[in-house]
């Protein structure tokens, strides 16, 4: 199979990927502050919502640029998949925060804090992997970052299962169970989407490293 000796340069795509990745890092940091302190709840949820809107704008710009660019830095399908996966991470962080406010759940417990910690770590790895994408010499580093993202996603699965078991065991209030089940699902899904990002990045690195 013919392989290009270098990745064609369209630097604006990399700028947009990096902006999107940094955006989800910022959102994960606000989510962690929200979960850890349970202070300034509405302003923090609104801050995440504004970051989600910013993420949508970045996504739309990538897609528009994709339609009008003849030579892209890597496969168009991979660009679209990466863009969607990054946007999905943001959407689930926003959904988790929004549900906490909407349902008036009160101060989050241990499992929500553990999931927020994992989301922080996973989005940080995603951002670093996206930064590596711009530099051909660093493409091989993406593989190690993807392994770590996969490990974090597995850790989130463990916490999620423990959270669900405790939720059904400890509460007789079904409304409480339903609310927190949805929140936990959104938080765990954010790590799933980080893994989707990792899978796309790993594929790009395999093609071009």
Protein language model regions, located:
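Cytosolic, long alpha-helical scaffolding segments
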Residues: 1-209
């Amino acid at each position: 199979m013919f392989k290009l000796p270098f990745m064609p340069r369209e630097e604006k795509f990399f700028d947009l990927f990096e902006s999107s990745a940094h955006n989800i890092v910022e959102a994960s940091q606000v989510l962690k502050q929200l979960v850890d302190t349970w202070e300034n709840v509405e302003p923090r949820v609104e801050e995440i919502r504004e970051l989600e809107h910013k993420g949508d704008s970045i996504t739309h710009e990538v897609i528009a640029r994709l339609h009008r660019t003849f030579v892209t830095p890597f496969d168009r399908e991979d660009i679209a998949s990466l863009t969607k996966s990054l946007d999905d991470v943001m959407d689930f962080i926003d959904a988790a925060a929004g549900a906490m406010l909407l349902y008036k759940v009160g101060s989050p417990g241990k499992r929500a804090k553990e999931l927020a910690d994992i989301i922080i770590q996973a989005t940080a790895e995603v951002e670093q992997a996206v930064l590596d994408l711009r530099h051909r010499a660093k493409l091989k580093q993406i593989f190690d970052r993807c392994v770590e993202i996969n490990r974090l996603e597995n850790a989130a699965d463990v916490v999620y299962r423990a959270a669900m078991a405790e939720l059904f065991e400890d509460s007789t209030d079904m409304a409480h169970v339903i609310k927190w089940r949805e929140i936990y699902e959104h938080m765990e899904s954010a790590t799933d989407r980080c893994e989707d990002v990792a899978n796309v990045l790993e594929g790009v690195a395999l093609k071009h490293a």
